[in-house]
Regions:
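Short, well-formed alpha-helical segments that are part of the catalytic scaffolds
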Residues: 13-27
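A conserved acidic beta->alpha catalytic loop
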Residues: 24, 39-48, 88-89
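Conserved donor NDP-sugar-binding/catalytic core segment of glycosyltransferases
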Residues: 92-122
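Hydrophobic helical membrane-anchoring modules
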Residues: 172-251
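Short aromatic/hydrophobic "clamp" motif used to bind/position activated sugar donors
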Residues: 81
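Glycine-rich, basic loop-to-helix element that forms the pyrophosphate-binding segment
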Residues: 60-76
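Acidic helix N-cap motif at the loop->helix transition within catalytic regions
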Residues: 16-20, 43-53, 93
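Cell-envelope/extracellular polymer assembly enzymes that use nucleotide-activated donors
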Residues: 3-6, 35, 169
């Protein structure tokens, strides 16, 4: 049976988060009508254990997030592509919400409301600021769970091969193709990068990258600082220091 939805998860050295997300996904209503594709780089043994035959596993030659996302989309069979970070948890009725949204022929894709798993007040403020940004601009980040009609994705030729801001660039191009909507139900995502690096320091770094991207200036030179070493998992501190304890995922 052809799946209605293809869930594509890019992952790099993040088997523990991937395992929790897959545990959560397989319990959602409607999962039988979907396919899950994991496009991975880095920790091969840990990633294979995490997947445990619950998803199709790919190992693309290129390890940038854009390359992983495009590789997953290239083998997907669903009518709609749903790009999900390895540390994110869509709402329990996410698939139904996506199907309902795309039943409108004018809608080409969209994203979910953003909310951090962790409850720190600083992250709540950052969430509030971020919501003002994307509700005004309709430019969404990947940690909001971007979704798009498969035909539209191929029409757009997928994600551009960027080291940074590939999700924002895609979202900006998507709304030029057709109606890109915001599903008001929150998708939960880990704030570990903000906690590891310092919430305000990370926020201002993101704003700096956003400014450079908006002005069409180079952001590539900051990619290693943002992504971190290829041998380390996401959310590792930029420098030595205390890594805040993560909240338990909502499963």
């Amino acid at each position: 049976m052809t799946p209605r939805l293809s869930i594509i998860i890019p992952v790099r050295n993040d088997a523990a988060s991937l395992n929790r997300t897959l545990d959560y996904l397989v319990g959602l209503v409607g999962i039988s009508e979907t396919e899950i594709i994991v496009a991975a780089s880095g920790d091969e043994e840990g990633t294979k254990r995490a997947v445990a035959e619950r998803a199709r596993l790919l190992w693309p030659a290129d390890s940038t997030r854009a390359a992983l996302l495009n590789a997953g989309a290239a083998v997907a069979h669903g009518q709609v592509l749903f790009f999900l970070h390895a540390d994110s948890f869509p709402p329990a009725n996410a698939f139904e919400l996506i199907y309902h949204s795309t039943s409108d022929e004018r809608v080409v894709g969209g994203a979910f409301e953003h909310l951090f798993v962790e409850r720190q007040w600083t992250l709540r403020v950052i969430t509030w600021l971020n919501r003002i940004r994307y509700q005004f601009t309709r430019n969404y980040y990947g940690d909001q769970g971007l979704f798009v009609r498969t035909s539209v994705f191929h029409q757009m030729r997928g994600y551009k091969d960027l080291q940074l801001m590939e999700d924002l660039d895609f979202s900006q191009r998507l709304k030029r193709v057709g109606k890109s909507i915001l599903i008001r139900t929150p998708l939960l995502t880990s704030g570990r990068r903000f906690l590891a690096h310092g919430p305000w320091r990370t926020l201002f770094f993101v704003l700096w990258l956003l400014l450079l991207h908006t002005l069409r200036l180079d952001t590539e030179r900051y990619s290693k600082r943002w992504r971190g070493s290829a041998s380390r998992p996401p959310g590792s501190p930029w420098a030595q220091g205390h890594l805040h304890e993560e909240a338990e995922p909502p499963i």
